[in-house]
Amino acid sequence: MESIMEEADSYIEYVSVAERRAIAAQKILQRKGKASELEEEADKEKLAEAKPSLLVQATQLKRDVPEVSATEQIILQEKEMMEHLSDKKTLMSVRELAKGITYTEPLLTGWKPPLHIRKMSSKQRDLIRKQWHIIVNGDDIPPPIKNFKDMKFPRPVLDTLKEKGIVQPTPIQVQGLPVILAGRDMIGIAFTGSGKTLVFVLPMIMIALQEEMMMPIAAGEGPIGLIVCPSRELARQTYEVVEQFVAPLVEAGYPPLRSLLCIGGIDMRSQLEVVKRGVHIVVATPGRLKDMLAKKKMSLDACRYLTLDEADRLVDLGFEDDIREVFDHFKSQRQTLLFSATMPTKIQIFARSALVKPVTVNVGRAGAANLDVIQEVEYVKQEAKIVYLLECLQKTSPPVLIFCENKADVDDIHEYLLLKGVEAVAIHGGKDQEDREYAISSFKAGKKDVLVATDVASKGLDFPDIQHVINYDMPAEIENYVHRIGRTGRCGKTGIATTFINKNQSETTLLDLKHLLQEAKQRIPPVLAELNDPMEEAETIANASGVKGCAYCGGLGHRIRDCPKLEHQKSVAISNSRKDYFGSGGYRGEI
């Protein structure tokens, strides 16, 4: 019985092969299921670690990024705006751009300062610059020279300077002339009436003379030196300065140098005759110069010296494309000089693309008013201005300059003054060349007491002994105001500038004027003193960024974010793009 029970206990149920296989397969599947579940969980954990939610990411970023103050944010915004504005096509010729030519070293000249000046230590040089209030930037800057004799000019040039009453160089000449004579590219910033013209005219004559003595210019060749000016009047004035120094050199036995005034309003045939004989020096306005180059009447193959006078006007929107076209015609490296009383950061950044290792010579802040001018600002109602003008003319003896924003005001004032028996002449862009020349020559000669003009006469024109400048209206741009009042107080003489303001002027313009008066230590009228001034709060931004006022136009009463000039130019660009898009002329092109 027991043996039967043992057998029953040890009995193993028979499982068929098919069933065993099915059980084994089921176990395998179960194991796989568990493994896949574990893998899924592991993958989920990995994903959770690798990809946090956007909210988590944003929180982490905020935590990781250091806090930026409001001041730093404004500085970054302004920096981006300036980079965007300066990101334009460089001032290089088509050939240079096509071949990828970049000049890394300035042009060499044979000029060297005397040994005793070369031996001056850097401390001695800096001391001279400090005494003359000269600020320089750049590498390997030539030393300042305090007299014309040490600059090694020929005797006829020195005699002509003496005849003109120029015995000692002005601050811009002390540093600017050695820089240019050494062959360096330069940005010259100095207030009007500081002697900028001689700084680029004298070295150009020396270079032309040197080239002529080495290899005389053949018929149809030239120019060697080119000066570009924004207005016909300024070009004519510069040309006259060139002629004043060229004539004595010829009389002293030096090779003759031919110079050409290349401006509109003059018959092109007479200009072409000079070019055909071979020309050394050309003083031009952008329009006529561009025309002659495009028609292949003149070439810049031999040109090695270029000056942009009143560069802020030339490189600005008005003449920017014309200047680019002029640069397209250069065949080799040239020495490039930019001069102006106002040189905003925007223009400096843009212009540096054309310069090789430039030296910046700054005599007084760019855009600062001449300290020899007494500035008087008066609140005058619009309807009372023309009558009050007669009272203002009594402040000083003639000659007096009156500036207006628009041509109609110039004509009205001119007519009113003639009716009142005042010897007056007028110029503006609407008058023909003959009238403009008569007005300027008779005023310069002292035959007329008053010149009424638009801003065409404010850009660099040199009228001797101007006692008084009257701004019939405040210009929209503060740099135009600086140019206007710079017609008086020249060469160390004191002058008066009277400006009429009223509610027609924008607050931004008046704030710029207020800060300019403060900088020049002038009396602030109550109407300006009462203005709500946001720049008082913006002082920390100015200190942090190193830029005082607007980096675009140079105005002290606002920052670049509120610049009226920039806003105006943006709106002009938008309207121009609309014209291009919709068509503004030709077949089916009229709006």
Curated annotation (Swiss-Prot):
Domain Helicase ATP-binding: 177-361
Catalyzed reactions: ATP + H2O = ADP + phosphate + H(+)
Domain named Helicase C-terminal: residues: 372-532
InterPro entries, alphabetized: DEAD/DEAH_box_helicase_dom, DEADc_DDX41, Helicase_ATP-bd, Helicase_C-like, P-loop_NTPase, RNA_helicase_DEAD_Q_motif, Znf_CCHC, Znf_CCHC_sf
GO biological process: mRNA splicing, via spliceosome
Motif DEAD box mapped to chain: 309-312
Domain of life: Eukaryota
SMART domains: DEXDc, HELICc, ZnF_C2HC
Zn finger intervals (CCHC-type): 548-565
PROSITE patterns assigned to the protein according to its UniProt record, in alphabetical order: HELICASE_ATP_BIND_1 (PS51192), HELICASE_CTER (PS51194), Q_MOTIF (PS51195), ZF_CCHC (PS50158)
Motif Q motif positions after renumbering to this chain: 146-174
Keywords: ATP-binding, Helicase, Hydrolase, Metal-binding, Nucleotide-binding, RNA-binding, Zinc, Zinc-finger
The keyword RNA-binding appears for this protein: yes
GO MF assignments: ATP binding; ATP hydrolysis activity; RNA binding; RNA helicase activity; zinc ion binding
Positions annotated to bind ATP: A190, F191, T192, G193, S194, G195, K196, T197
EC number(s) reported in the record: 3.6.4.13
Family the UniProt entry places it in: Belongs to the DEAD box helicase family. DDX41 subfamily.
Annotated domain remarks: The Q motif is unique to and characteristic of the DEAD box family of RNA helicases and controls ATP binding and hydrolysis.
Entry protein name: DEAD-box ATP-dependent RNA helicase 35
Annotated organism of origin: Arabidopsis thaliana (Mouse-ear cress)
